[in-house]
Amino acid sequence: MTPQLRAEKSAAAMWSTDTASQALGMRIDHIAPGAADLSMVVTAAMLNGHGIAHGGYIFTLADSAFAFACNSYNQLAVAQQNQISYLAPGKAGERLHAAAREQSRTGRSGVYDVTVTGEDGRTIALFRGLSRTIKGHHFEEEMTP
């Protein structure tokens, strides 16, 4: 199995039970080994008291992209630590894009950076996630010698 097919099958398996991302209207725009791009439209229900995207929804989009990137090897991985810096507001009706990219993967630990951008390309937030692999796989895979 190619690494790309493994990433696609891992994403499909995760997506099938990821009701949180689905309920928020997220979509997977791109998946590759160690990488994932997700997007989401900021709805009226996602606005805070300032009339801009609530930071929790921006964080959730970034966290979901991170999850799909670190789980792209058919090895279960969970978040160990996350941090985010908000740089610009997300606007009502705007589609936000989260691009997660692997920076390091050694042993059971991984480091992933996620950039959240607005439709015009401006940077909304920078997120860093640390992952840890755990026992289990997303799907059964025959290993060839």
Regions found by a protein language model. Name each.
Residues M1-P145:
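Terminal targeting signals and extreme-terminal segments of soluble enzymes
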